[in-house]
Amino acid sequence: MPRPRSAILIATAILMQPSPHPLGAQQSQPPAPNRFEKNVAAYEAADKTSAPPQGAILLVGDSQFYRWETLAEDLPGYTIVNRGIDSFTMTDVVHFADRLVLPYKPRLIVVHAGGNDVNTGRTAAQVLGDFQAFVRRVRETMPSVPIAFSSVTPGPGRWSQAAVRRETNGAIKNFVASDPRLIYIDLWKAMLGPDGGPREDLWLKDRIHPNDAGYELRAAIMRPILGSPDQRRTP
């Protein structure tokens, strides 16, 4: 069971065995989102104690956001509300959008999810469909807010799933290209070595989660998309 975590508010100045399913393959059902009820409730309780600012950058997604302990150091000057949850899937992002996304009225939403979906046998088409559902839900209340998809990463521990992960990234990248309010953050290419395989120096011993160097690289790729530090506006 993922451990609950209190809300992370950075206010320093922006105060998975392989599942090689093609797009048309038989599709699996996602795990029940209610397994994360305690995690989401913990964020809500923390918000009641200390409400995060609106108009910030919102991170929502899986453990790669949840475990970003050096976020304030890697992206100084930005107001970032981090709502990552360990083991979260894209399906979970959609399910909890009303509670983890909409209340914050962010100026930019960054989603990192999809890797856990692939690890449980979900197809690229299913992950794309869930991301599209998330975009539709956000657009109902915040029609102009930019939404960025942070690509599924090539962790060495999940390299056996590389084909489906690439397919997932490609499907979402193509969808994002159809809407100027959507952004694709390409982490995949930067995390590959000269041999075309994943760089081993960017990962913890589990070979799934980024180490400090991996997060530094992520921050460098994200920074141009985030805009100027402390650039805040209400969507």
Residue map of PLM features:
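Charged helix-capping and loop-helix junction motifs
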Residues: 124-134, 164-169
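Structural recognition of the beta-strand scaffold that forms the well-ordered cores
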Residues: 57-61, 80-84, 108-112, 146-151, ...
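Residue-level preference for short coil/turn positions at secondary-structure junctions
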Residues: 52-54, 76, 105, 143, ...
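Short amphipathic alpha-helices and their capping/turn segments at secondary-structure boundaries
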Residues: 45-57, 96-102, 136-139
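Sec-exported extracytoplasmic/periplasmic mature domains
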Residues: 98, 102-105, 114, 132, ...
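Oxyanion-hole/transition-state-stabilizing segment in secreted/luminal serine hydrolases
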Residues: 65-81, 90-129, 148, 152-156
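Catalytic His-Asp segment of secreted/periplasmic serine-dependent ester chemistry enzymes
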Residues: 154-235
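N-terminal secretory targeting modules
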Residues: 1-60, 65, 69-74, 227-235
